[in-house]
Amino acid sequence: MPKYQPKNGELNPYIPRYILETPRYQQDIINKSPEQEDAQDQTTTAHDPLAHQRKTGEIIDNSIAQSGTGIKDEFKGTIRVEENESYDSKRDRWYGYSTEEWLTHLKNWNDKKQSRKHASAQDNDDSDDTDYELELIELELDKKDMKKNIKKDPMEKMLRDRQDIPAYIYNITSNPNNKIRIEYDPKSRLAKDSAKGFLNKRNQFVKKLTGDGDELMKLQKMAQELDNEHEKDRKLAKLKQEFYGEENPKTVPQTDLSLSLEASPTLMMLKSKQLQNEKLAKSIQSKQEVMEKYNASTESDEKESKKTGHLEDKLFLNHKYIYGSYYENGKWGYKCCKQFDKNSRCTATD
């Protein structure tokens, strides 16, 4: 088969279409002549990534050293006019920046900020906003709490008391000889301190009460004891009435509400103080009886202060007191003879 030879202006039908058609980004290069390409290479390249930022089509080749192109100095004759220049002013002088250019940049930045603030103010402009804020203030809420749907307890910000010592610190130094012993239950994960509580019949750890709670428990216990005594008297009087008949119908005492802590708490507090005073008086009386029985002196005997081996506690020159035990008119001396001379002997007659 003879080889196909296309005529002038005729395309070869055997060449695919994607080869015949040139891409759009190569059409300008292909259609230009070699002279035009050489001229373009001297001024600009075909693909300039910073073409949208250039005021002119000229591209500056930064690979060539061009230091000092922005320097524009003022001269008086042949002497350059020097000013008090800072780092920024020297940098602007080297790159050729002027103050007017910086002012234009600042103006553009401020205009953009103002436009953003104005847009945000329009978005937040709501007639019900003030009423909504007042309602939140009345409810002691904040916008952040409403967004997160969480209201923090103000007690969470309180500092822990320094005397609040955790149980695990006691557990570090605890041993059978210590007064404070921690028993840790791994099942319930509770540290049980015998000094702070006890285990009840249900194997539950009950803390010991302190302060007002302890006083209330003592009052309740005392009221219960008084009520039990009164109940015994009522039962005994009732039995006597049943046994002896109705000779004394009014001898059975009625329920006494003054013995109830809930009915009369103030009266119970006064009774507890009265019982405490009586108990204290009995203990003092019994102690006095014992002292009288064994002929013991109730007054405490004066005990001499113990002497130490220091020089301050040693007596010299038959003195009964040390030098410095007496002071008068700005002078120190001996208390026994009231002499101010340190080397003098004691002249006291006692």
UniProtKB/Swiss-Prot annotation:
Function: Involved in pre-mRNA splicing.
Subcellular location: Nucleus
Alphabetic keyword roster: mRNA processing, mRNA splicing, Nucleus, Spliceosome
Gene Ontology MF term list: pre-mRNA 3'-splice site binding
InterPro entries in alphabetical order: Slu7_dom, Splicing_factor_SLU7
PANTHER family: PRE-MRNA-SPLICING FACTOR SLU7 (PTHR12942:SF2), STEP II SPLICING FACTOR SLU7 (PTHR12942)
Organism the protein comes from: Candida albicans (strain SC5314 / ATCC MYA-2876)
Transmembrane segments: none
Region (Disordered): 28-58
Subunit structure, as described in the record: Associated with the spliceosome.
The name this protein goes by in its record: Pre-mRNA-splicing factor SLU7
Feature: compositional bias, Basic and acidic residues: 49-58
Coiled-coil annotated spans: none
Gene: SLU7
